[in-house]
Amino acid sequence: LRPAGCFDMHLGKNLYDDKLPNEVKYYEVSNAEQIQACDGSGKLVARSNGGNNIEELYGAGGWVASPAELLRFLAVIDKDPGIPDLLSDASIDYMTQEVPSAYPIGWIETTSRGEWFRSGTLAGTSALMKKQKDGYSWVFLTNTSSWKGSRFPHYIDNAVRQAMASVH
């Protein structure tokens, strides 16, 4: 991550007491039910404080980062000539190839038009990182939950798309 200019991007922890110095507090909906702790103790906890096993999600996410850090990371793998990439073009092409009925590597969706989409939603957080076909890239993060669940990033994508279309 350091070659990408990312100095404050870390793997998250399960408990609020173990949160990183620049990490936010996560807020769930007010009537969220508690669940058994992921550590097997049987204790009832909030999903965002020991209910979700973030440490087992490292292969799929579980990162703590600011929008700026995520954009720095994206900038070194996006094939934009303005900032040199850390990966070869062949690796980026492989990672972002559009494969019917399968996920690309590290992304939720990629298109033949050059769009890349990665989202993640857990209790207390939602994230969306997008590289658009027009060359714009952006990140949206929240430290709150929505009952829209995994569909929430799609609502945000639509809102950002409409906003950007109104200023072009």
Give the positions of each predicted feature.
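Zn-dependent metallopeptidase/amidohydrolase metal-coordination segment
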Residues: 118
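Short, well-ordered beta-strand elements
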Residues: 126-131, 136-148
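Short, flexible micro-motifs
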Residues: 64-65, 123, 127
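Extracellular/periplasmic catalytic domains that process cell-envelope and extracellular macromolecules
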Residues: 99-101, 121-123, 130-134
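A broadly conserved detector of short glycine/acidic/proline-rich loop/turn motifs that flank catalytic sites
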Residues: 111, 122, 143-144
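Short, gly/Ser/Thr-rich active-site loops of penicillin-recognizing serine hydrolases
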Residues: 112, 147-168
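Short, surface-exposed loop or secondary-structure junction motifs
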Residues: 1-115
